[in-house]
Amino acid sequence: MTAPTGTSATTTRPWTPRIATQLSVLACAAFIYVTAEILPVGALSAIARNLRVSVVLVGTLLSWYALVAAVTTVPLVRWTAHWPRRRALVVSLVCLTVSQLVSALAPNFAVLAAGRVLCAVTHGLLWAVIAPIATRLVPPSHAGRATTSIYIGTSLALVVGSPLTAAMSLMWGWRLAAVCVTGAAAAVALAARLALPEMVLRADQLEHVGRRARHPRNPRLVKVSVLTMIAVTGHFVSYTYIVVIIRDVVGVRGPNLAWLLAAYGVAGLVSVPLVARPLDRWPKGAVIVGMTGLTAAFTLLTALAFGERHTAATALLGTGAIVLWGALATAVSPMLQSAAMRSGGDDPDGASGLYVTAFQIGIMAGALLGGLLYERSLAMMLTASAGLMGVALFGMTVSQHLFENPTLSPGDG
């Protein structure tokens, strides 16, 4: 779709040191953006005390973030479609840098929320362009591996970034954590500007993107986005309360709870590179296996929740289900985004933007539904997750050609 300046996407040796460096920069961008997004999770109490507001009010920062990202993603992607892809990425990272600086200096909650809105606006733009940039750096046969490589940054944000900012918030204050994220975001923005090709669109390619382009109905893309929204909703119904699930359903408490949370994140970190090659060769099979595993994990946790008995055996089964959940929830995301981009034809950025919007809607819907069901029982909450995952799995299984790689045109190399 783009013509990368100084980079050949048709080389027979795609994983050169230069391209590995470029993909690492993209992974760092994903890492710092996700770390900034979830920073309030580990700093809830510290922010609440410092700004003299309730913990509940601070918690709304995440919900409003998802709402702003969902509303602004598609319009912003269309508005910037004619930009070189590197510019869109760097602008997103600069906005993140400014946002974190505003947050670090915020004298009150309103200013903090305003700072968060700035990076929420460009959240969707970054996630709409980052995966397409990765796929354009390598041949089409390596697109899945390129996409999964940037999700390593997402996994590291959960395993390293979030715990690190949480620890800094507890020991030295949340403002210092925000300052550190500011510096890291600025460094990644500079690295992206220096390491990545400009990726300018040709005149014929501009006909397929932007505000003036015609966007015919794409049932395949719509179906991928709807199934993504259902699956993400199912995940976030329970993920918001994963600590409670580990404690009250699995029966793991104290220091072991923290270790199991870490295992959840590490499992996701390990799973991402493992699914890269299968995603390129058997995209539908890889997605079906991942969704089947997620459905099985939620079904097992549901059974344990209804059982209400804690034994060594149930703790072992529950631990396995949590680790499986962590591994596959992280692995399925790049699978679905790859499917969305393949469905987008000549406009993978626009397709990726619609995917990001569906993902953000799923986050909001899952958090809302999870809160309502949590007040009733954990068993009902987990049942909803298992049911929604089952619905998404069924839709993906019966859909024809949903995850197939389209036939490449000669010009695609």
UniProtKB/Swiss-Prot annotation:
Task of the protein: Active efflux pump that plays an important role in chloramphenicol resistance.
Membrane topology, from the record: Multi-pass membrane protein
Subcellular location: Cell membrane
Induction section of the entry: Expression is negatively regulated by the transcriptional repressor MT1396.
Domain of life: Bacteria
GO molecular function, a single term: transmembrane transporter activity
PANTHER family: CHLORAMPHENICOL EFFLUX PUMP RV0191, PURINE EFFLUX PUMP PBUE
Identification of the protein by name: Chloramphenicol efflux pump MT0201
Keyword set, alphabetical order: Antibiotic resistance, Cell membrane, Membrane, Transmembrane, Transmembrane helix, Transport
A Gene Ontology biological process term: response to antibiotic
